[in-house]
Amino acid sequence: MLIFAEKYDRNKEEKRKMKRIISILLYMAVLLPLAAQPPKHEVRAAWITAVYGLDWPQTRTTSPEGIRKQQAELIEILDRLKAANFNTVLFQTRTRGDVLYKSAIEPYNSILTGKVGGDPGYDPLAFAIAECHKRGMECHAWMVTIPLGNRKHVAALGKESVTKKKRAICVPYKREYFLNPGHPQTKEYLMSLVREVVERYDVDGIHFDYLRYPENAPRFPDSYDYRKYSKGRSLAQWRRDNLTEIVRYIYKGVKAMKPWVKVSTCPVGKYKDTSRYPSRGWNAFHTVYQDVQGWLGEGIQDQIYPMLYFRGNHFYPFALDWQEQSNGRQIIPGLGIYFLDPSEGNWTLDEIERQMHFIRAHGLAGEAHYRVKYLMDNTQGLYDALEEDFYTAPALQPAMPWIDNVAPTPPSGLTVETPENGYWKPVSYTHLTLP
């Protein structure tokens, strides 16, 4: 009887062990793969920098062959982004008082042709939008806002420079020129550029860069405007209010034209000191007068791309702070992938990987990579890691419920026709020169 009881106990114990093993195997087989799956909705963005041809273009359009080569360079970048399941392109559209689209206000950037104001023979922004959309990617017009360039650059633009056309809203400071955020007409001038882009192009977003005062600018020459318009506010508060008014004015203007066009800014990466970690004197609020969390609270931004080109305690507490103060808007940290280059910082790949894991774990909307060259060069194996580990499946854009909650209308009235002599042909991209 005792032997039977011992066998019975052993059998019960073995069954319990087997159940535990089966449970563990089920967890590994079902839950772990689910945890490893990329999010269904996520912004996966890359900045394509045109200034100085840092990312694009390398070829000048001095001939029809030059046009084809310049377009082919961009297509190669977009093809590789699409292959790695990116879904957002931040395409530099305005640099410093010059542009990469056919504008009635500012001249073409010389990087396209080698000549200031030179017509490249096609419209780069229209081409970029069309090629992004062919690949199912959004194209946002990235516009440098306040800086106008150094004296040499402004002189090269000549009479086409805004410093000549709109002297009242431009100021020199430390051998460079800037739009003056304190002048009431500055917001109207910037809105005129945005209006050109939003009205004429099927752009998915307007993305502002350098929407800020020069760093550490106690002597920025705006004392006349401060005396005239400050109405008793401190200089710092007046400057912050000036930038906020520009943001508010343009946001409302864009939404009045096309509510679905996203409006975003890439501010300085640290808003201000947090309870978790200090900003060490370099932040958006105090250093360059960007009250970005105020913009979020007021609902006059759809997305914020904080330039969190840091690591360790200079990244994680501030990324979390942005998310906690987002007011439900999308926070997409900019990752400093250029630091993977040995000549820039020689970060190891795991620095970027840890940041991406953190972004997902804390529910941020995605990330943006600065800049696309380091993706194309597969610096430290980053492109491979994205393609094989992080972006293994396509992702949809996160919803913007503050715009509307209406789902797209299902397609209707579709028909399928089979011609008598028809045949299947794979899709190929036709690289047309756009007007």
Role assignments for model-derived ranges:
Residues 200, 205, 212-267, 271-277, ...:
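Active-site neighborhood of glycoside hydrolase catalytic domains
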Residues 302-313, 332-399:
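Substrate-binding cleft of secreted/luminal carbohydrate-active enzymes
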Residues 392-429:
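Pro/Thr/Ser/Gly-rich low-complexity, intrinsically disordered linker/stalk tracts
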Residues 430-435:
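Conserved small/polar residues in nucleotide/adenosyl-binding loops
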Residues 72-97:
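Catalytic domains of carbohydrate-active enzymes, especially glycoside hydrolases
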Residues 40-46, 86-94, 124-169, 207, ...:
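Glycine-rich, aromatic-flanked loop segments that form ligand/cofactor-binding clefts
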Residues 53-69, 146-196:
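Active-site-adjacent "subsite" loops/lids of carbohydrate-active enzymes
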Residues 101-113, 147-173, 211-231, 276-282:
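Aromatic- and acidic-residue-enriched segments that line the glycan-binding/catalytic groove
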